Amino acid sequence: MKVLITTDWYKPAINGVVTSVCNLREELQQRGHEVKILTLSRTAHSYEEEGVIYMGSVNAGYIYPGARLRVSPGRELYRGIIEWNPDIVHSQCEFSTFFMAKKIAEECKIPLVHTYHTVYEDYTHYFSPYKKWGRNMVQFLTRQISEKVDSMIAPSTKIETLLKDYGIHCPVSVIPSGIDLSKYDAQTRTDSRERIRRKYKMDRKTTVLLYVGRLAKEKNVEELLEYQQKVQESGTILMIVGGGPYLETLRKKAAELGVTGSVIFTGMVSPAEVASYYPAGDLFVSASTSETQGLTYAEALAAGLPLLCRRDQCLRAVVEEGKNGWQYRTEEEFLKDLKNWKEKEDDERRGMCSYAKQSAEIFSQKRFAGSMEQLYQRQIEEKQVEREKHLAKGHQYCILG
């Protein structure tokens, strides 16, 4: 089948949407499907390159850091998509490219499915100081989106519940986004662990709490810095891998708390290098409750890293307490779980690491693509039945006329 995936975010940006899109495209192509990406150019110039169509856009960082809005119509490229005649459109974002996705689906008379990646009510502080007003607006806009698509995809039961609470008007399927598990092969674990630890001058005995992700206010990394103040004397290092608009704020916070000597900020790391950082850690930590699914959780597990994360609904089917990690609700629970890990014998830790890696199988990109393939086929068939009914009804009116 021919699949058009639309997204406001694409490489070189680093986030869960980009990871999901790239992995889905790769796996669908391996299964013999034709896949094109429609996204926004980093300039006002529209062009196509290696099956990716870039529509001209302008900076919209005043709305959200790194955001862009389409300005160039790119008529020839748009016409090329219509002539390519996709079988289905899969939109990944709710803004510029969504409206292009809707227009293409209508013109080609094909289904439009949409993945809801973002809990927007956790991001309303970027454009409104009033949380209740922001939540009401998000609910309204989400319902509007749901009226324009044939089906929505929730990466986790957390998002499925949220969408139902919003009162959306279309079917919802829970399909976790997939990752390439081979990137986290155990054969590379020892080499990567030693290389990264040498680079940042950490010895083998140091307990390293690893955070990987974008540094933004909604990620609540400040909480990890506050907890680090309590554990730094016990030979524990907090390693924060990633960049973002909140990096300098976090550096200042670390200085205020007196933890700069036990916190490592790596800054932005290239996507090709991110996988090599996981083995450097002993536990993966996160204080965020704004994740829809949290692909970094899946990546950490795939690398054999148990989780120590703030309790969140998106982790309900992911964390098996005491087996592949822990969820905490308070500082006391965080400190207790960390102490539990440190007091384990080496063979117990290895057992947890092994089980963590095993539990990541549910996030295989092959499983992800297989589920998407089935959904696409079902939506295409339903759209065909709908068209046939419409034609039959029109034919009946002609006869009666």
Where are these regions (language model features)?
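Aromatic "clamp/platform" in nucleotide-sugar-dependent glycosyltransferases that forms part
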Residues: 289
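Conserved acidic donor-binding segment of nucleotide-sugar-dependent glycosyltransferases
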Residues: 321-332, 339-346
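A conserved mid-protein helix/loop that constitutes part of the nucleotide-sugar donor-binding site
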Residues: 19, 207-230, 245-251
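Nucleotide-activated donor-binding/catalytic signature segment of Leloir-type glycosyltransferases, i.e.
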Residues: 249-269
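Short alpha-helical donor nucleotide-sugar binding micro-motif in glycosyltransferases
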Residues: 266-269, 276-281
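Donor nucleotide-sugar binding/catalytic pocket of nucleotide-sugar-dependent glycosyltransferases
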Residues: 39, 53-56, 135, 139-191
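N-terminal subdomain of nucleotide-sugar transferases
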Residues: 1-56, 373, 390-401
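Short hydrophobic beta-strand element within catalytic cores of glycosyltransferases
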Residues: 306-309
